[in-house]
Amino acid sequence: MVYRVYVEKKAGQTHEADSLLREIKDFLQIDTLSSVRVLNRYDAENIEEGLFTYAVNTVFSEPQVDDVSYEVPAGQFVFAVEPLPGQYDQRADSAAQCIQIISQGNRPIIRTAKVYVLAGELTEENIAAIKKHVINAVESREASLELPETLAVAYAAPETVATVDGFIALDDAGLSALLD
């Protein structure tokens, strides 16, 4: 079973969201944006429900400065950003290691994403510009807001790669023939 939790800084601690709001207004010139909320989303699998509940307040959040919720936050526009498949996710890896240490058992599968909740009078062009500003296509992509059935990633078996025997011994004519 996949468990999900959203973690957001409490009022007065929302430095990342406040900074992003200023960036969007200053650099993108989108003055109709009234607020930005930034939440960290954690999905966990291969973990017992009791351990997940314990980890919510010990691994995924700091109760003194974070608010926790289990539902997608309401807002005029919500989107999430996750690392690309194969991209190292330090937040997920650290959380998985901490939970493994706490449980003294197997390491759970953890996936994270940042969820952005925007409010204001925004056009489709404004939203596209904000997404382009927030999503670094080299390392991340827009994530689904739906809870997946599993976090396990299935990779297709690679096809057999043809080998070239005697490549080192090929002369110019042989290399030309190989390229054709």
Model-derived features with residue positions:
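Core nucleic-acid recognition elements
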Residues: 1-180
